[in-house]
Amino acid sequence: AIAAVFCKETGVMTSLKLNGMEIINGKDGFVYDNYRFIENDRSCKPGNGLDSIGTCEIVPSKGGSVIVKTTRGGQLASQVITYTFLPNGTVDMDVTLTPQAKELRRAGLVANIVPGLRNVNYWAYGPDENYNDRKESTMVGRYQTTVDDMVVYYQKPQSMGNREGLRELTLTDAKGKGVRIETQGEVSFSALPYNDMHLAKTNHMYELKKDPFITLHI
């Protein structure tokens, strides 16, 4: 069974329960995120540039499905996310991001996930951290890790843990319950115990304290 709650003002999904289990932490569902903290780019401003107000509407559908279309403008990028809730318990997300600026630091979504889903199983490039311009040393396959083990200990805290070529991602708790995400197209992901604002405000890795949620970038 699926239960979802949306904010009428912003269009953000504030709650997603799968068979009674909450997936979204603190009402912070999927939104466009531009901020990526790199130590050499401290001058770059944080924030996603999204408008404070968006839209949220239920679209007529057939076959027992429920379709919710959300939109939100922004100075850096505008987003249209259409959620289709299927009778079999699947939530299909169709995402369109339209750049409004010449240079974006990210082109993807971020969500805060409940902290208990710390076990990570993924089909992508791995097992080590990799990026679009340096993934040749890794191989596509299915890998198991944890949110904590996706942390990379750089000399200074910064964005980390990315995996390219994502096709399937599962986040589960100690009992094996959680959420599975399948993707299409060129997609990467990271699942970390810190968000980029937290990394930017911390000078040394040993000073980092885990956030009370998991930051999922897709």
List PLM regions with ranges.
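Beta-strand/loop-rich accessory regions of lumenal/periplasmic or secreted enzymes
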Residues: I2-I218
